[in-house]
C-alpha cells in the first residue's frame, strides 16, 4: 500500500515539476500562458494587446459600394409615337377635380385597370395645381370682393398602343366608373402637353436671356 502511495506522489511531483518548468519557460520568453481544464498550459498570441475586440463586427466589406448619384440633367422631349391605322399612339387621360384625394385615387384606379387589361402605361404624373379666384360684384358700387378660391388638381395617365377596336370599350369602362366631381378628357399627346408639366419661371428665363 505504501509503495503505491509513493508511486502516486512521485507522479504528482513530476507533473508539478513539469508545469513549473513550462511556466518558467513562458515567462522567460515573454509570453503569457492561459490555463485550461486539466491544468494544460496554452499559449495564444494577441496581435492587438490594447484592442482585444479590434475587428469584431465588421460588416462594411459585405455591402456593395454605392454608386455616385448622377446629376439630374434637363428633361428633353421624347419622340412622340403617332400610332398606326389600327392603334393609337400616345394618349393622355386627364383627370381633373377640386378634391386632390379624389383625383389621385381615381388616377390610381385607371393605372391599375390599364395594367390588368395589358395596356401599356408610359407614365403617370401630376400637373401644376391651378387656383381660380371667384369675385363678387357688390349691389351698390363697382368694387369686386373676393368670394371664394377654387383649387383645381389634375392627374394624367399616359398610355400607348391602345387598339382602335378596344378603345371604345376601354373608354366606356372608365367613364362608367367615373366618380362624381371628376372631369375626364382623353386626347393625343403633343409637345405642348409636355411643356405644360413644368411651372413657368419668367424671372429665371429673363436672367438666362440676359446672360446669353
Curated annotation (Swiss-Prot):
Q: Which GO terms describe its biological process?
A: mitochondrial translation
- Residues found modified as N6-succinyllysine: 199
UniProt entry keywords in alphabetical sequence: Mitochondrion, Ribonucleoprotein, Ribosomal protein, Transit peptide
Q: Which Pfam families would you find in this protein's record?
A: Ribosomal_S10
Nucleotidyltransferase is among the record's keywords? no
Q: Where in the cell is it found?
A: Mitochondrion
Does this UniProt record's set of keywords contain Nucleus? no
Please list which residues make up the signal peptide: none
GO CC field: mitochondrial inner membrane; mitochondrial large ribosomal subunit; mitochondrial ribosome; mitochondrion
Q: Where is the transit peptide?
A: 1-28
The family classification in the record reads: Belongs to the mitochondrion-specific ribosomal protein mL48 family.
**Subunit-level organization:** Component of the mitochondrial large ribosomal subunit (mt-LSU). Mature mammalian 55S mitochondrial ribosomes consist of a small (28S) and a large (39S) subunit. The 28S small subunit contains a 12S ribosomal RNA (12S mt-rRNA) and 30 different proteins. The 39S large subunit contains a 16S rRNA (16S mt-rRNA), a copy of mitochondrial valine transfer RNA (mt-tRNA(Val)), which plays an integral structural role, and 52 different proteins. mL48 is located at the central protuberance. Interacts with OXA1L.
User: What protein does this entry describe?
Assistant: Large ribosomal subunit protein mL48
Amino acid at each position: 500500500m505504501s509503495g503505491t502511495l509513493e508511486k502516486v506522489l512521485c507522479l504528482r511531483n513530476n507533473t508539478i515539476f513539469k508545469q513549473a518548468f513550462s511556466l518558467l519557460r513562458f515567462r522567460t520568453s515573454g509570453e503569457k500562458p492561459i490555463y485550461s481544464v486539466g491544468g494544460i498550459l496554452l499559449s495564444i498570441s494577441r496581435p492587438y494587446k490594447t484592442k482585444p475586440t479590434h475587428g469584431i463586427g465588421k460588416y462594411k466589406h459585405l455591402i456593395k459600394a454605392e454608386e455616385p448619384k448622377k446629376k439630374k440633367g434637363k428633361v428633353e422631349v421624347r419622340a412622340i409615337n403617332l400610332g398606326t391605322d389600327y392603334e393609337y399612339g400616345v394618349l393622355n387621360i386627364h383627370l381633373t377635380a377640386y378634391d386632390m384625394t379624389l383625383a389621385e385615387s381615381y388616377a390610381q384606379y385607371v393605372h391599375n385597370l390599364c395594367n390588368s387589361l395589358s395596356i401599356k402605361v408610359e407614365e403617370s404624373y401630376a400637373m401644376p395645381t391651378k387656383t381660380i379666384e371667384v369675385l363678387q360684384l357688390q349691389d351698390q358700387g363697382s368694387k369686386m370682393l373676393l368670394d371664394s378660391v377654387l383649387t383645381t388638381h389634375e392627374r394624367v395617365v399616359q398610355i400607348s398602343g391602345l387598339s382602335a377596336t378596344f378603345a371604345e370599350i376601354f373608354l366606356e369602362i372608365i367613364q362608367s366608373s367615373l366618380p362624381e366631381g371628376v372631369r375626364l378628357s382623353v386626347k393625343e399627346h403633343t409637345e405642348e402637353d409636355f411643356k405644360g408639366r413644368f411651372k413657368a419661371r419668367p424671372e429665371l428665363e429673363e436672367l438666362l436671356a440676359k446672360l446669353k
